[in-house]
């Protein structure tokens, strides 16, 4: 470790958290202690002399979005076992990870950004990463089939602008969970 570094980076580098995103989540949840004191600031500067602990249970997904989708699946009784799913607005892949842990057979992770999807998901043969793709340009032909389930957590664009494209990616009768952002 360098003489001083950000807490979230150090937790990931030392393997106390599997990724920087999970480190940030654990910090935000009050699960990280520096020298016996809870620390809720991911950018806090730590040194090699500091004692770092992660207590309790951090989120079980690569991103916090997975918690949102997991709760929706639970409340609405949606079973993803064996389904082909789309994660629209994948980012780090919280929804993708949740879908896989819920039994999805395959997930197409679509995001207009680049190099955001967690490396564990990029390496997973059940995941097709379609980064750099505007969701409005995605088609069933691009996927090779219509999906059985769609999860959407798009940012920086109104859900209303992408909903027609999203609906075109799934077959009739398929379920979808789409988050609505208050800024739109």
Predicted regions and their residues:
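A basic, amphipathic helix-loop patch mediating RNA/tRNA/ribosome contacts
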Residues: 1-50, 85
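Conserved alpha-helix/loop element of class I SAM-dependent methyltransferases that forms part
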Residues: 64-84
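Conserved class I S-adenosyl-L-methionine
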Residues: 81-91, 99
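N-terminal Rossmann-like NAD(P) cofactor-binding module of classical short-chain dehydrogenase/reductase
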Residues: 86, 151, 177
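Residues at the N-terminus of the alpha-helix immediately C-terminal to the conserved SAM/SAH-binding loop
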Residues: 91, 95-96, 113
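Conserved S-adenosyl-L-methionine
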Residues: 98-106
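S-adenosyl-L-methionine
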Residues: 106-161
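A short glycine-rich, Lys/Arg-flanked "PGG" loop and its adjoining helix->strand segment in the class I
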Residues: 160-180
């Amino acid at each position: 470790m360098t003489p001083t570094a950000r807490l979230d980076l150090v937790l990931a580098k030392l393997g106390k958290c599997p990724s920087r995103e999970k480190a940030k989540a654990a910090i935000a949840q009050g699960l990280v202690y520096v020298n016996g004191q809870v620390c809720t600031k991911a950018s806090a500067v730590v040194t090699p002399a500091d004692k770092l602990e992660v207590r309790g249970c951090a989120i079980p997904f690569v991103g916090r979005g997975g918690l949102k989708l997991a709760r929706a699946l639970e409340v609405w009784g949606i079973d993803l076992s064996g389904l082909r799913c789309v994660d629209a607005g994948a980012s780090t892949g919280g929804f993708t990870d949740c879908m896989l842990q819920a039994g999805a057979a395959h997930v197409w992770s679509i995001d207009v950004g680049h190099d955001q999807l967690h490396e564990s998901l990029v390496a997973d043969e059940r995941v097709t990463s379609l980064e750099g793709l505007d969701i409005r340009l995605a088609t069933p032909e691009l996927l090779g089939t219509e999906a059985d389930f769609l999860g959407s957590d798009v940012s920086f664009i109104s859900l209303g602008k992408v909903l027609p494209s999203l609906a075109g990616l799934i077959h009739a009768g398929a379920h979808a969970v789409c988050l609505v952002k208050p800024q739109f």
